[in-house]
């Protein structure tokens, strides 16, 4: 390894003590991937909550993202492509974020002491974001893998079958809180870091952050309840397999 690389690796500076720009670039990439995922989270929540309007509305939304405007019956593979893209962005964001995680017990103790002494709200928020991000990486990966491999199962009957009969309700309740807290805290910290709303005070941004958290968690819980209710109805109506659930969704299709 070159001497310059060793110096830069230890101190983040070149041999001439010129600050390396790689860390700023990595920081920008972390912010960019986080913003994309946060915006996707917001859009995704509004889309899945369409079941609160009606089963048919949720079916139409699902088909819209299968390209039903251009392909009469829609193409589930389009959803798989989107899921694959989100997985790649999620993995990239996770690896970029890991740079700032305590990597051993000593670093964790330093952070914990700092957090205790400072008693600063944003430091506590970062800790919550780190915990939810760690949980979300595993929980969201499972959900995205299902969307990648079974895109045709997305629909009012298929999704609710997965919720109840396949017991995904347990995963989704933890994923709901992890995603909504992580996303809202992330957007708040991005707004401060990049100075997006200079006319809004930090106190104002915090209020917006908590309003977002409450709104999306309440919307998510209502949506969660709707899928549970629909999944129980599936059982009462004799739907015993995912294929039967998919066929039940197909009844909403209009030639």
Curated annotation (Swiss-Prot):
<keyword id="KW-0349">Heme</keyword>
<feature type="transmembrane region" description="Helical">
    <location>
        <begin position="78"/>
        <end position="98"/>
    </location>
</feature>
<feature type="binding site" description="axial binding residue">
    <location>
        <position position="93"/>
    </location>
    <ligand>
        <name>heme b bP</name>
    </ligand>
</feature>
<comment type="similarity">
    <text>Belongs to the diheme cytochrome b FrdC family.</text>
</comment>
<keyword id="KW-1003">Cell membrane</keyword>
<feature type="transmembrane region" description="Helical">
    <location>
        <begin position="33"/>
        <end position="53"/>
    </location>
</feature>
<feature type="binding site" description="axial binding residue">
    <location>
        <position position="182"/>
    </location>
    <ligand>
        <name>heme b bP</name>
    </ligand>
</feature>
<keyword id="KW-0812">Transmembrane</keyword>
<keyword id="KW-0816">Tricarboxylic acid cycle</keyword>
<feature type="transmembrane region" description="Helical">
    <location>
        <begin position="208"/>
        <end position="228"/>
    </location>
</feature>
<dbReference type="GO" id="GO:0046872">
    <property type="term" value="F:metal ion binding"/>
</dbReference>
<feature type="binding site" description="axial binding residue">
    <location>
        <position position="44"/>
    </location>
    <ligand>
        <name>heme b bD</name>
    </ligand>
</feature>
<dbReference type="InterPro" id="IPR034804">
    <property type="entry name" value="SQR/QFR_C/D"/>
</dbReference>
<dbReference type="GO" id="GO:0005886">
    <property type="term" value="C:plasma membrane"/>
</dbReference>
<feature type="transmembrane region" description="Helical">
    <location>
        <begin position="168"/>
        <end position="188"/>
    </location>
</feature>
<dbReference type="InterPro" id="IPR004224">
    <property type="entry name" value="Fum_red_B_TM"/>
</dbReference>
<protein>
    <recommendedName>
        <fullName>Fumarate reductase cytochrome b subunit</fullName>
    </recommendedName>
</protein>
<keyword id="KW-0249">Electron transport</keyword>
<dbReference type="Pfam" id="PF01127">
    <property type="entry name" value="Sdh_cyt"/>
</dbReference>
<keyword id="KW-0997">Cell inner membrane</keyword>
<keyword id="KW-1133">Transmembrane helix</keyword>
<feature type="binding site" description="axial binding residue">
    <location>
        <position position="143"/>
    </location>
    <ligand>
        <name>heme b bD</name>
    </ligand>
</feature>
<comment type="subunit">
    <text>Part of an enzyme complex containing three subunits: a flavoprotein (frdA), an iron-sulfur protein (frdB), and diheme cytochrome b (frdC).</text>
</comment>
<comment type="function">
    <text>The fumarate reductase enzyme complex is required for fumarate respiration. This subunit anchors the complex in the membrane and binds a diheme cytochrome b.</text>
</comment>
<dbReference type="InterPro" id="IPR000701">
    <property type="entry name" value="SuccDH_FuR_B_TM-su"/>
</dbReference>
<keyword id="KW-0408">Iron</keyword>
<keyword id="KW-0813">Transport</keyword>
<keyword id="KW-0472">Membrane</keyword>
<feature type="transmembrane region" description="Helical">
    <location>
        <begin position="126"/>
        <end position="146"/>
    </location>
</feature>
<keyword id="KW-0479">Metal-binding</keyword>
<dbReference type="GO" id="GO:0006099">
    <property type="term" value="P:tricarboxylic acid cycle"/>
</dbReference>
């Amino acid at each position: 390894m070159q001497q310059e690389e060793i110096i830069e690796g230890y101190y983040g500076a070149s041999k001439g003590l010129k600050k390396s720009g790689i860390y700023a670039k990595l920081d920008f990439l972390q912010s960019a991937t986080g913003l994309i995922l946060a915006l996707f989270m917001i859009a995704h929540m509004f889309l899945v909550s369409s079941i609160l309007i009606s089963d048919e509305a949720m079916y139409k939304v699902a088909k819209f993202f299968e390209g039903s405007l251009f392909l009469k019956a829609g193409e589930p593979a389009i959803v798989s492509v989107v899921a694959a893209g989100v997985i790649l962005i999620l993995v990239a964001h996770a690896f970029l974020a890991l740079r700032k995680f305590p990597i051993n017990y000593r670093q964790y103790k330093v952070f914990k002491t700092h957090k205790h002494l400072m008693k600063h709200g944003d430091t506590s928020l970062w800790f919550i974001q780190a915990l939810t991000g760690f949980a979300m990486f595993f929980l969201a990966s499972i959900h995205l893998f299902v969307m990648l491999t079974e895109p045709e199962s997305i629909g009012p009957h298929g999704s609710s079958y997965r919720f109840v009969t396949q017991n995904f309700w347990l995963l989704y309740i933890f994923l709901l809180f992890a995603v909504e807290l992580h996303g809202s805290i992330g957007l708040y910290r991005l707004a401060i870091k990049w100075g997006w709303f200079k006319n809004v005070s930090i106190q104002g941004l915090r209020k917006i952050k908590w309003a977002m958290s409450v709104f999306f968690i309440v919307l998510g819980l209502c949506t969660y309840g709707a899928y549970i209710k629909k999944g129980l109805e599936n059982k009462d109506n004799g739907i015993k397999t995912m294929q039967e659930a998919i066929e039940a969704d197909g009844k909403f299709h209009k030639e």
